[in-house]
């Protein structure tokens, strides 16, 4: 999934309960982005949309949320910045996040099929490891922010998300449609 299929409930220790603005330029960037990602991922429809884009187009959920985070401040992520961000994430994604996700999903399916609490605990542990790897991706993205231009948040998000999806090989028209859909979910309450 993205953000490790964390179930965002009141008792979730990973769910952040307050909203805050973005401060681009260091450790606060990482924490602000991570908080934004958790909050927005918890919004109705966002997780499902992100996971669908991940599964259908190979989109990186953290990169999608990063585009939305930067758009929150009116910054559009350009193609060159997307390519750089994708290159920064690729080794971690290929060697850690995707294998953890695949293992977690397989174990979760087995736990459900066999009604096995022990396997469910194993899947939950893998989910925590996947979440830690995604947090590392958030750090890489926040630390490498550059090549942005200003504009309205939702419009920038739609544009940046469409560019991100096109980078995954999605047809331009579909990328624009899916980008606009996710931008609406992220920014509309």
Describe the role of every protein-language-model region.
Residues 47-90:
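N-terminal interaction modules that seed assembly of large macromolecular complexes
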């Amino acid at each position: 999934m993205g953000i490790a299929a964390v179930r965002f409930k009141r008792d979730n220790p990973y769910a952040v309960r307050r909203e805050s603005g973005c401060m681009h330029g260091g450790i606060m960037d990482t924490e602000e982005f991570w908080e934004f990602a958790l909050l927005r991922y918890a919004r109705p429809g966002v997780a499902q949309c992100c996971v669908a884009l991940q599964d259908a187009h190979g989109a990186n959920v953290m990169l999608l949320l990063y585009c939305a985070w930067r758009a929150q401040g009116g910054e559009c992520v350009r193609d060159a910045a997307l390519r750089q961000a994708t290159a920064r994430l690729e080794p971690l994604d290929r060697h850690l996040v995707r294998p953890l996700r695949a293992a977690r999903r397989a174990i979760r399916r087995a736990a459900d099929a066999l009604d096995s609490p022990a396997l469910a605990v194993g899947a939950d542990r893998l989910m925590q490891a996947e979440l830690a790897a995604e947090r590392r991706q958030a750090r890489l993205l926040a630390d490498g922010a550059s090549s942005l231009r200003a504009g309205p948040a939702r419009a920038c998000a739609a544009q940046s998300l469409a560019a991100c999806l096109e980078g995954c090989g999605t047809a331009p028209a579909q990328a624009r449609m899916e980008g606009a859909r996710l931008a609406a979910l992220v920014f509309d309450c």
